[in-house]
Amino acid sequence: MKTVKILDSHTGGEPTRLVLEGFPDLGTGDIESRRKILSEQYDHFRRATMLEPRGNDVLVGALLCKPVNPKASAGVIFFNNTGYLGMCGHGTIGLVASLAHLGKIQVGTHLIETPVGDVEATLHEDHSVSVRNVPAYRYKKAVEVNVEKYGKVTGDIAWGGNWFFLINDHGQRVASDNLDQLTEYAWTVRQALTAQGITGKDGQEIDHIELFASDTEADSKNFVLCPGKAYDRSPCGTGTSAKIACLAADGKLEPGKLWKQASIIGSQFIASYEQAGEYVIPTIRGEAYMSAEATLFMDENDPFAWGIQL
């Protein structure tokens, strides 16, 4: 019998499952090397915690790791039902709020090691969390892709910790009662990008699609389709970072000015950025709430101990 201890939270409605104990020893290398070991040798632990019957396609997992830098508060490896993420904004907010709930950190700024670089996260007195993300940038502007049933679609390719294709002019109604259509549209766009060889820098896969619309309560509302075909309930921290990079590149948002990004369900992040040469350093602020603490059991006699794989 294998057991895994977890602490679940949600950030703006998007769940994070923090793995506290039970995963194999991944060594003492940097976080990226440990992610590689996990994916190549122990991926069944990811599947057990993310896939049904213990997980679902909305969950993002966060494996708590001992950091390399003694000044860091934590290291983290993010993953979901389909694989691994470089960075996760809502997940980092969930991580910090969870560590505070456990009494492991106090109010203040904390260094967090991720597979794509270090980020700073500040736990505020009101329990909200600000994440100073990895450098973000727009890779290409106004990229055209021919999409089956929809014709020519134009969007920007940007990095915010993951690769995004950001679409402003899409002709879709961005509303919570239109999720099936939004999912179908965004998934078709993603398939077209792959089929036509449109990628991020160095051929990296664009695995997030982000649609934007106006909003009465925020500067913008988005719909974000994640790699596993589930939509993001939060405004998406890395997606908001990619959006900020595009706004900065177009001269539509000045450094330090606040941008309020709403999600498809109405939750919000507050974002701003600092200019750093050709990059921007986004800061995303949001709140996370604890939802469950549990121990997962993987019984060797259970045919679905390591998840249902369809």
Swiss-Prot record:
Protein EC:
5.1.1.8
Which residues does the Swiss-Prot or TrEMBL record annotate as the active site? C88, C236
Answer whether the UniProt record assigns the keyword RNA-binding to this protein. Answer: no
EC class name: isomerase
Keywords from the UniProt entry: Isomerase
Q: Name one GO molecular function term.
A: 4-hydroxyproline epimerase activity
Q: Which residues bind substrate?
A: G89, H90, H208, D232, G237, T238
**Pfam families xrefs:** Pro_racemase
Q: Catalyses which reaction?
A: trans-4-hydroxy-L-proline = cis-4-hydroxy-D-proline
Matching PANTHER family? TRANS-3-HYDROXY-L-PROLINE DEHYDRATASE (PTHR33442:SF1)
Family per similarity comment: Belongs to the proline racemase family.
According to its UniProt entry, the function of this protein is described as:
Catalyzes the epimerization of trans-4-hydroxy-L-proline (t4LHyp) to cis-4-hydroxy-D-proline (c4DHyp). Is likely involved in a degradation pathway that converts t4LHyp to alpha-ketoglutarate. Displays no proline racemase activity.
Protein's UniProt name: 4-hydroxyproline 2-epimerase
Specify the taxonomic lineage: Bacteria, Pseudomonadati, Pseudomonadota, Gammaproteobacteria, Moraxellales
